[in-house]
Regions:
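Short loop/turn segments that connect beta-strands within beta-propeller blades
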Residues: 68-72, 115-119, 164-168, 212-217, ...
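Structural motif
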Residues: 65, 104-112, 154-161, 206-211, ...
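Surface loop/turn motifs at the tips and blade-to-blade linkers of beta-strand repeat domains
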Residues: 37-42, 77-81, 125-130, 173-184, ...
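Beta-rich catalytic cores
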Residues: 44-45, 83-84, 107, 131-134, ...
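Conserved blade-ending motifs and adjacent loop-strand segments that build the rim/top face
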Residues: 219-238
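Beta-strand-rich domains and repeat architectures in extracellular enzymes and scaffolds
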Residues: 35-62, 84-87
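Blade-loop segments of beta-propeller domains
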Residues: 72-109, 124
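Short coil/turn segments that connect the beta-strands within blades of beta-propeller domains
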Residues: 53-54, 92-93, 141-143, 195-196, ...
Length: 261
């Protein structure tokens, strides 16, 4: 009887776990939506997008294209070596980009900076051999916040780390299962600070996840999953509208979006 009881409990746990994993991958209802408000063709729109009030920037593995917001015309392309550029964000009139040697091993990451006046890429901070690949970086509360990711069965090890201006680690957090369960074998590709927390994106899904810093512990607190017009990848804030810019990778487009509740 004890063996039968044990087997029944095991079967119930197995079925329940499988059902929960299935629900995680379903499209979740949301009380909000990031709605597309515009788009712009950009050959470099394969990794991420960023914006100023006058221009938008399409980011590919190796270069950044600058486009006039009003005309949609390409006005410049970056110079300087790059292997795998990821998300970018503007700070003090310069574009800061996560960069790594992905998919090569061992992992190596750095932050590159681009001045729109000369469109030259150069290294700001070289992490050397890193624990995971750097996919996005932002500034918040006077510190650097950097996302290092793992893929496949190891993607649960992906973490957000907070550095001071001397690149001393202050804290790090992993992601909640509500987010990890929707990434498949991929990981966190983009992120930014907004609305009292972080909006982050996956690699492919047309949705964004909002998380915030926990009051205690080392796991970020899940807030919500919201539909979005971006096909995953890097996102950035749009200073002109207060919305976001991202990409449609397949269509090679920069996509503009605003939050509707």
């Amino acid at each position: 009887m004890a063996i039968v009881k044990f087997l029944l409990i095991w079967i119930i746990l197995f079925v329940t776990t499988a059902a929960l994993e299935s629900v995680e991958r379903e499209k979740l209802p949301a009380a909000a939506s990031w709605t597309k408000t515009g788009e712009l063709l950009a050959a470099e729109a394969t990794q991420a997008a960023a914006a100023t009030k006058s221009h938008v920037y399409a980011i590919s593995n190796r270069e950044v294209g600058q486009y006039d917001r009003k005309t949609g015309r390409k006005t410049a392309v970056s110079t300087g070596e790059a292997h795998h550029l990821n998300s970018g964000f503007f700070w003090n009139q310069k574009l800061y980009l996560a960069h790594s040697n992905f998919p090569n091993k061992p992992d190596s990451s750095d932050i590159r900076v681009l001045d729109p006046r000369d469109m030259r890429l150069h290294v700001l901070k070289d992490f050397g051999k890193s624990e995971g690949s750097l996919t996005w970086v932002v500034r918040h509360k006077g510190d650097w916040w950097c996302m290092f990711v793992y893929y496949g069965d190891q993607n649960h090890k992906s973490y957000l780390v907070r550095f001071d201006d001397h690149w001393q680690e202050k804290s790090r957090w992993t992601f909640p299962q509500e987010v990890l369960g929707r990434l498949g074998k991929m990981s966190i590709s983009g992120g930014l600070w907004k609305d009292g927390g972080f909006w982050v994106s996956g690699h492919d899904e047309r949705e964004l996840y909002r998380v915030r810093l926990p009051k205690a512990g080392s796991v970020l607190e899940y807030v919500e999953t919201v539909p979005a017009p971006f096909t995953g990848q890097g996102i950035a804030e749009d200073p002109l509208t207060g919305g976001l810019v991202g990409i449609d990778r397949k269509e090679r487009k920069i996509v503009f979006s605003e939050l509707e509740r």
